[in-house]
């Protein structure tokens, strides 16, 4: 008999806690800051930076090929590797975004 009373008391406590939790005012979400960029803007900026890195690497390689003074082979190789790494990182981000989109689209409604 005491187990039944204990169970009922626990159920009443759980219900009261549930009611308290539901009665509490939910915090209002702050609106997005006016100056904060959106996700698409941030993504376009990242792609733009990768493009700039690729173009700078190509320009440096062309300058080295024509024998322009002040352009060292090590600088060309470093710029080339920076461009390669940034492009690979962008590709991985794209792959993860596509995978996330596919996962969301395959979720049952």
From Swiss-Prot:
Its main location: other. It is found in: Bacterial flagellum basal body. Coiled coil: none annotated. Keywords: Bacterial flagellum. GO terms for biological process: bacterial-type flagellum-dependent cell motility. InterPro entries: FliE. One of its GO terms (cellular component) is bacterial-type flagellum basal body. GO terms for molecular function: cytoskeletal motor activity; structural molecule activity. Signal peptide: none annotated. Belongs to the FliE family. This is Flagellar hook-basal body complex protein FliE. It comes from Pseudomonas paraeruginosa (strain DSM 24068 / PA7). The gene is fliE.
